[in-house]
């Protein structure tokens, strides 16, 4: 059976899940392996942050993963579709597809087409339903424009283009099926290398990107969530779940976290935070056996990431709790903590919707601040840690329409809704998203060693000024630096010019195949390399910038590839294009250095001149927003 044949059998599993009738299959007819699943009622909003939901989802994806053959997998999935909760089904089947060897090359269809109601405002969905009813024929095209979810009375609405970006929200959902918190290597027979560190780094970068765009729109940097008793800002998502028929709950301004009787108390959250911070201060954590595990420079961040999330790899979840996941659930249920009003939770309960809420970023900056407490215990990098002897960056230029000027603009795209919602025919939603003109890095390098050298090229971008126009100090600026690319380059003796297109970024996914493309066999390949559509959307590679041009610094650093690379990574690993945030499938993370190096630790140098070594370059660039093109 070809990959294309497998893909065509997979796709119907994901279609029209919002229209399923309740309890379609008689449980007595189901496969005996599925007898224990189906506990979460259909129509309930599934949350991979909720431990009970996650427990059942894990049972299902492990059953599907262990299916004897591809035919057996399809058989089980088809039955499970009629038994289990809709969101739980998609989560578990997606995890299984990404990790089964006989599904290599098969692509999970885009979550925004499976559940368009998680991405498209309820007003727009309603408009689409009315337009569909009016059309005379299924061949007649229906195109509706997306509705705005706020106005200028709310300053945060300036960031709606970022928070509500379909690609960004899909990325967050996809990352969490690539790295399920309950992943058990002893059961799944595959190790997720540096999973805890990836949890830290992906979310840290998301916060840095969000702050860069806040500065681009004239807003101040976000204020981290820091107090479990603080009153939260209001938020209304304008989303309605079609599987439950209820809205994703709004959050009135002024509410604060309250105990969830059936889940977690506010005091638990405060206690877990204090235990984590204390362990960071003393330099070790206590595992389930009472042993002291050091938070060293090499593995400490990975250990801490597992504790904070908390994942199956947590060394002691009884003591350190479940801070990150529980926070998501508490904020999602802040309006109805004891369930007396039988309301849906808010968008913070779901990985495909939580980026829409401003509190997501404030909460993750709170989480990141705990990671930064650990990073502050590590020694600052010395010159010897940063240098690449005999290699000097002579010049670096961003080649675009104008040198060192990157243009951004709002671009129109469409989303097909008819695979997720039952319509007479195709129904598309037109929406706008940020995009940028393509550009190329040109890096002039001199290799004076007399030998061929192999280098890791690391490219970051960071703003130069704060919201008041003051110059950012380097140690303050480092938390704003966003990774743009990381790749291998060969340096001949003498002068070299390294060129690299922005579209080749190790951070981004270039294109996510649509349902229709997958049905035609496009984007289906056993050698596909994007793990697997997990990367940050390419159109959001750089911040928005300003109309007059916003000042940024492009940082380029070359390090010794022989010291950096991990031997098991041969550059051809399946699903490795967006490796910076997503890792490489069934392989070790291909860079020995800390994620975010060299900006992951405190920088004592007050100026660029004091920090810079010959293998570094700081280039002034502008990002200019052109509104529409």
Curated annotation (Swiss-Prot):
Gene: HCF
Biased composition annotated in UniProt, kind: Polar residues: 503-513
Disulfide bonds: 534-582
Assigned GO CC terms: extracellular region
Function noted in UniProt: Hemocyanins are copper-containing oxygen carriers occurring freely dissolved in the hemolymph of many mollusks and arthropods.
Protein origin, superkingdom: Eukaryota
SUPFAM superfamilies listed in its UniProt record: Di-copper centre-containing domain, E set domains, Hemocyanin, N-terminal domain
Subcellular location per the Swiss-Prot or TrEMBL entry: Secreted, Extracellular space
InterPro entries: Di-copper_centre_dom_sf (IPR008922), Hemocyanin/hexamerin (IPR013788), Hemocyanin/hexamerin_mid_dom (IPR000896), Hemocyanin_C (IPR005203), Hemocyanin_C_sf (IPR037020), Hemocyanin_N (IPR005204), Hemocyanin_N_sf (IPR036697), Ig_E-set (IPR014756)
Residues that hold Cu cation 2 according to the record: 324, 328, 364
PROSITE patterns for the chain: HEMOCYANIN_1 (PS00209), HEMOCYANIN_2 (PS00210), TYROSINASE_2 (PS00498)
Subunit composition and interactions: Tarantula hemocyanin is a 24-chain polymer with seven different chains identified.
Pfam families reported for this sequence: Hemocyanin_C, Hemocyanin_M, Hemocyanin_N
Keywords tagged on the record: Copper, Disulfide bond, Glycoprotein, Metal-binding, Oxygen transport, Secreted, Transport
Protein name: Hemocyanin F chain
Tissue expression profile of the protein: Hemolymph.
Region feature (Disordered): 503-522
Anything else known: The two copper ions bound each have 3 nitrogen ligands (presumably contributed by His residues) and share a bridging ligand (possibly contributed by a Tyr residue) in addition to binding oxygen.
Broad class of where this protein is predominantly found: secreted
Residues annotated for Cu cation 1 binding in this entry: 172, 176, 203
Molecular function as annotated in GO: chloride ion binding; copper ion binding; oxidoreductase activity; oxygen carrier activity
């Amino acid at each position: 059976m070809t990959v294309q044949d497998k893909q065509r059998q997979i796709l119907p599993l994901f279609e029209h899940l919002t229209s399923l009738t309740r309890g379609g299959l008689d449980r007595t007819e189901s496969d005996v392996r599925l007898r224990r699943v189906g506990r979460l009622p259909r129509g309930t909003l599934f949350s991979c942050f909720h431990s009970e939901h996650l427990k059942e989802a894990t049972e299902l994806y492990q059953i599907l993963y262990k299916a004897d053959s591809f035919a057996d997998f399809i058989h089980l999935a088809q039955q499970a579709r009629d038994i289990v909760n809709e969101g739980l089904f998609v989560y578990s089947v997606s995890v299984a597809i990404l990790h089964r060897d006989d599904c290599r090359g098969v692509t999970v269809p885009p979550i925004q087409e499976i559940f368009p109601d998680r991405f498209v405002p309820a007003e727009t969905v309603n408009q689409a339903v009315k337009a569909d009813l009016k059309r005379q024929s299924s061949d007649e095209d229906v195109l509706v424009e997306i509705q705005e979810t706020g106005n200028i009375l709310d300053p945060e609405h300036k960031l709606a283009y970022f928070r509500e970006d379909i690609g960004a929200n899909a990325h967050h959902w996809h990352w969490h099926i690539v790295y399920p918190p309950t992943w058990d290597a002893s059961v799944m027979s595959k190790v997720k290398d540096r999973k805890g560190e990836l949890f830290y780094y992906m979310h840290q970068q998301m916060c840095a990107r969000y702050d860069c765009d806040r500065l681009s729109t004239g807003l101040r940097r976000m204020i981290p969530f820091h107090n479990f008793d603080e009153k939260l800002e209001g938020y209304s998502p304008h989303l309605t779940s079609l599987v439950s028929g209820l809205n994703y709950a709004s959050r009135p301004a002024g509410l604060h976290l309250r105990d969830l009787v059936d889940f977690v108390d506010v005091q638990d959250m405060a206690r877990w935070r204090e235990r984590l911070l204390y362990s960071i201060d003393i330099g070790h954590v206590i595992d389930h056996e009472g042993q002291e595990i050091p938070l060293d420079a090499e593995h400490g961040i990975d250990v801490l990431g597992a504790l904070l999330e908390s994942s199956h790899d947590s060394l002691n979840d009884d003591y350190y709790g479940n801070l990150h996941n529980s926070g998501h659930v508490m904020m999602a249920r802040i309006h109805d903590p004891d369930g007396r009003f039988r309301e849906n939770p808010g968008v913070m309960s779901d990985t495909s919707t939580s980026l829409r809420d401003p509190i997501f970023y404030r909460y993750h900056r709170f989480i990141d601040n705990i990671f930064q407490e650990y990073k502050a215990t590590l020694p600052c990098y010395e010159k010897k840690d940063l240098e690449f002897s005999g290699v000097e960056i002579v010049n670096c230029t961003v080649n675009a329409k104008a040198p060192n000027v990157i243009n951004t603009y709002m671009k129109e795209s469409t989303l097909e809704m008819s695979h997720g919602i039952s319509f007479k025919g195709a129904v598309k939603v037109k929406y706008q998203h940020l995009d940028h003109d393509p550009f190329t890095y040109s890096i002039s390098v001199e290799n004076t060693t007399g030998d061929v050298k192999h280098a890791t090229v690391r490219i970051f971008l960071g703003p130069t000024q704060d919201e008041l126009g003051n110059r950012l100090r380097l140690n303050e600026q480092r938390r704003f630096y966003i990774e743009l690319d990381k790749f291998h380059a060969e340096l001949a003796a003498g002068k070299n010019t390294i060129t690299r297109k922005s579209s080749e970024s190790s951070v981004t996914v270039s294109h996510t195949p649509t349902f229709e493309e997958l049905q035609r066999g496009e984007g289906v390949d056993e050698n596909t390399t994007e793990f697997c559509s997990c990367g940050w959307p390419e159109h959001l590679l750089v911040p928005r910038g300003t109309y007059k041009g916003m000042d940024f610094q492009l940082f380029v650093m070359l390090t010794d590839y022989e010291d950096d690379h991990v031997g098991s990574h041969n550059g051809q690993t399946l699903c490795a294009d967006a490796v910076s945030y997503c890792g490489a499938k069934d392989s070790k993370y291909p860079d020995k250095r800390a994620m975010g190096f060299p900006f992951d630790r405190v920088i004592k140098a007050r100026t660029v001149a004091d920090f810079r070594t010959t293998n570094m370059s700081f280039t002034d660039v502008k990002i200019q927003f052109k509104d529409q093109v």
